[in-house]
């Protein structure tokens, strides 16, 4: 089928909290972008139908090709979201939406593909020197959960994305303060993963743990209604609540440790890329936060890590971009 006959293509980036939808009407041209809350819809199909009804006026043709990036492992036809209530069959959903092809990929596979096509102004560099062109790239990002993937270049120049669930590795405390935070989390959960702290809910968990630290009993604290990631971040930056600043500093330090662990494991001299909606909200603070110092605090491997650049993805819709690139690869090569 000629490529022009595959447009518009239905794209989705589905996380734990929000589902983003868009229509790719031409290569890398995405229109009618909408963000829907997952909790407002009983199923993915309901959300898609609602989205398409909103875009009815701009739709000249019904999409017959779709690509959905979802924040959960893909292990066959049945998909169960990790951080929301949606479950679905890929084939049943394809039929329900009358699509010729529905590609469903992990959200951080989509993020990796998006990074392969990004321009310099889509990224904010945090330390390091230059990326090695053919070296592995590590992609991770705190959001509702914590995603991790790897982008490598094959010998023929093509790209390969390795999906993973690195957000669920066991968290390793770095110092006494992080041991305290870990102990608090361990009292609540059987397994304390990196995602427990490096996510939106993780900010709240760190705050709760620190609020019980000896010596902080009498400092100004947030009310229960104010215990949200957004408010903790805002209070941290305006300086009114030292405990919120300590929370954000601890979050960034922990992220530095994990990013370094991933970079060392992969030999990611192609760079580390931080995705997700959390860090861009406080990018100016993040540039001077404890993140980079902690990233390089790896003993004998400090010099190795000091050369690796870390980039914060500032682009608004990388998940949709990556879903579109993955679908393009599939249509051209019958693989992603």
Curated annotation (Swiss-Prot):
It is an enzyme of class 2 (transferase). It catalyses: D-glucose + ATP = D-glucose 6-phosphate + ADP + H(+). One of its GO terms (cellular component) is cytosol. The keyword Secreted does not apply. GO terms for biological process: glycolytic process. It comes from the Bacteria. It is found in: Cytoplasm. GO terms for molecular function: ATP binding; D-glucose binding; glucokinase activity. InterPro entries: ATPase_NBD, Bacterial_glucokinase, Glucokinase. CDD domains: ASKHA_NBD_GLK (cd24008). Pfam families: Glucokinase. Belongs to the bacterial glucokinase family. PANTHER family: GLUCOKINASE. This is Glucokinase. It comes from Helicobacter pylori (strain P12). The lineage of its organism: Bacteria, Pseudomonadati, Campylobacterota, Epsilonproteobacteria, Campylobacterales.
């Amino acid at each position: 089928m000629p490529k022009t006959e595959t447009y518009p293509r239905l794209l989705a980036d589905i996380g734990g909290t929000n589902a983003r939808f868009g229509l790719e009407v031409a290569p890398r041209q995405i229109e009618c972008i909408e963000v829907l809350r997952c909790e407002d819809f009983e199923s993915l199909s309901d959300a898609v139908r609602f989205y398409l009804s909103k875009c009815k006026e701009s739709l000249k043709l019904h999409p017959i090709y779709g690509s959905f990036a979802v924040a959960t492992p893909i292990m066959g036809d049945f998909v169960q979201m990790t951080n929301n209530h949606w479950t679905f069959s890929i084939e049943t959903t394809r039929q329900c939406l009358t699509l010729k092809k529905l590609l469903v990929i992990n959200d951080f596979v989509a993020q990796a593909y998006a990074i392969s096509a990004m321009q310099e102004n889509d990224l904010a560099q945090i330390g390091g020197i230059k990326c090695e062109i053919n070296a592995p790239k590590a992609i991770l990002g705190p959001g509702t959960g914590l995603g991790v993937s790897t982008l490598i270049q094959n010998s023929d120049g093509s790209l390969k994305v390795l999906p993973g669930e690195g957000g669920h590795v066991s968290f390793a405390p770095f110092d006494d303060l992080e041991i305290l935070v870990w102990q608090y989390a361990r009292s609540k959960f059987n397994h304390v993963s990196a995602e427990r702290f490096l996510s939106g809910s993780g900010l709240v968990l760190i705050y709760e743990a620190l609020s019980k630290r000896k010596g902080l009993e009498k400092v100004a604290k947030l009310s229960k209604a104010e215990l949200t990631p957004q408010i903790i971040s805002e209070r941290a930056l305006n300086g009114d609540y030292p405990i919120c600043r300590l929370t954000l500093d601890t979050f960034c330090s922990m992220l530095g440790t994990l990013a370094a662990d991933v970079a060392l494991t992969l030999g990611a001299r192609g760079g580390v890329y931080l995705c997700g909606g959390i860090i861009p909200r406080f990018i100016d603070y993040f540039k001077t936060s404890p993140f980079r110092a902690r990233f390089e605090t790896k003993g004998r491997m400090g010099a190795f890590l000091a050369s690796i650049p870390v980039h914060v993805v500032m682009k608004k819709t990388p998940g949709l971009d990556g879903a579109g690139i993955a679908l393009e690869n599939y249509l051209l090569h019958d693989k992603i």
